[in-house]
Every structure is written in C-alpha cells, then in structure tokens.
UniProtKB/Swiss-Prot annotation:
Family listed: Belongs to the CcmE/CycJ family.
Subcellular location(s) of the protein: Cell inner membrane
Annotated transmembrane regions: 8-28
Record's protein name: Cytochrome c-type biogenesis protein CcmE
Tree of life domain: Bacteria
Keyword Metal-binding: yes
Residues in compartment: Cytoplasmic: 1-7
Gene: ccmE
NCBIfam families in UniProt: PRK13254.1-1, PRK13254.1-3, PRK13254.1-5
GO cellular component: plasma membrane
GO function terms (MF aspect): heme binding; metal ion binding
Membrane topology: Single-pass type II membrane protein
Function: Heme chaperone required for the biogenesis of c-type cytochromes. Transiently binds heme delivered by CcmC and transfers the heme to apo-cytochromes in a process facilitated by CcmF and CcmH.
Organism of origin: Nitrosomonas europaea (strain ATCC 19718 / CIP 103999 / KCTC 2705 / NBRC 14298)
Length: 149
C-alpha cells in the first residue's frame, strides 16, 4: 500500500471507531434518561404511558393507605391543582410523610395509576426538589388565574 492509502485507511478506521463510540454512548445515555413531570402535566397526558419518568409534588393529606401485605402502599401526589394516585411496593424513606415533598420514579399504567419503583423524600425541613417546587408554583399561578376569570 502506498503511504497515501495507508493514511486514508487509518482516517476511515478512526472515523468508524469514533462513530461506533458515539452511538454506544448516546444509546446508554438514552436508556438512563429519566424526565420529571408534575401531577398537572401527567393529568394533561404529557407524560409517557409505560415509560419510566419521575413525578414530584406533595403527598396528599389522608391519602396514605397500606395494603394487607404491609409493603404495598397507595398514596397520592399533588401539586395543588391535580392529584395522581401512586402505588409503591417497598420500604419508604424515613422522612416520607403526608403533606411533605416527594419524588417518585416509575411508570404510568393505562389505568391512570402511577406504579413507583423508587420513592425519594426530602432530606431536611426546608428542602423541596427544584422541579417539584417549580411545579407547585406553576400550579398555584394557574389556579389563581382560573379563579380570577
């Protein structure tokens, strides 16, 4: 092979290897990407059904109920405008309480219930996840606007 052909072969091989690496990285990133939705967005059908996402807001007062097996829980997450029912099987974080901030990760089913795989509670008295705080503010503004009309 001539030096020019060797150089072109090396360049072609390098570009091919780089393309494969980029495709693998993007594929891994896509499979681990989890979006956040507020209860209002979920109620408006903006969240995907059957795909994993996070929902955040406040645990609705009086909504926490344990099933007979002791590990399955039913509760509702609200952003003060909409309420989404959640089912979770597992051990809840110690700071999980009604009326407090929470983020749940899981999938929305066709029956309108969010089946959580993971539940995250706030970690101190004043903390609320930024996404959940923003969703609560937007819901409050929307509620004020609808009342004013």
């Amino acid at each position: 092979m001539k030096p020019r052909h060797k150089k072109m072969a090396v360049i072609a091989l390098s570009v091919s290897a780089l393309t494969v690496a980029v495709v693998l990285v993007l594929n891994a990133f896509q499979s681990n990407l989890v979006f956040f939705f507020s209860p209002s967005q979920v109620a408006a059908k903006e969240a995907p059904i059957g795909k994993s996402f996070r929902i955040g807001g406040l645990v609705e007062e009086g909504s926490l109920k344990r099933e007979g097996d002791g590990t399955t829980l039913n509760f509702a997450i609200t952003d003060t405008a909409e309420v989404i029912r959640v089912v979770y099987t597992g051990i809840l974080p110690d700071l999980f309480k009604e009326g407090k901030g929470v983020v749940a990760q899981g999938k929305m089913a066709d029956d309108g219930i969010f089946y959580a795989d993971e539940v995250l509670a706030k970690h101190d008295e004043n903390y609320m996840p930024p996404e959940a705080a923003s969703a609560l503010e937007q819901a409050a503004k929307a509620q004020k606007t609808s009342l004013a009309q």
